Amino acid sequence: VCLSYSVRSSVETQKEYLVEQISCLVKRLGGTVTCIGEYPAWEYREQSPLRDKMIEIFEKQYGRKPIVQALHAGVECGLFAGQLPGLDCVSFGPDMKDIHTPKETMDVGSVERTWNYVLEILRNL
């Protein structure tokens, strides 16, 4: 039996702890553990001038507040922030459902809205 896990967390120490717990359990059951690749944690920043600016632009462009939330998903921001400490990162994109499943869908109209939003962000940086 081979089990594969993609362990992710927004807090590096919690991710390391979870990997250690899985490893201990597998070894206790007589198995072996091999760790291949990882996404570094991307920790939530209380202060983010970039996020604040993006919220301001979104509200002006769409007349409503954006949904802002911290996620545990492994995204490229963790890779960039891991290489450039102090980097202010924000992840956003089009509306998607059932990500990483055979039922994954993306709202095509939201792709255009996202593109227009990116252009406005770049104009305001």
Residue locations for each model-derived region?
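Zn-dependent metallopeptidase/amidohydrolase metal-coordination segment
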Residues: K65-E120
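A short beta-alpha structural unit
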Residues: L3-V11, T32-R51, G78
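Short secondary-structure junctions
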Residues: G30-T34, K65-V68
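Long, well-ordered mid-to-C-terminal structural blocks that present hydrophobic/aromatic surfaces
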Residues: V1-S23, K27
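N-terminal/domain-start segments enriched in small and hydrophobic, helix-friendly residues
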Residues: Q14, Y39-A70, S110-R123
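Conserved strand-to-helix beginnings and helix N-cap segments that scaffold or border functional pockets
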Residues: E16-V19, Q47, E104
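Active/binding-pocket-proximal capping segment
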Residues: Q21-L29, G37-P40, L50-D52, D95-M96
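Structural signal for hydrophobic packing residues in well-ordered secondary-structure cores
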Residues: I22, V26-G30, F58, Y62, ...
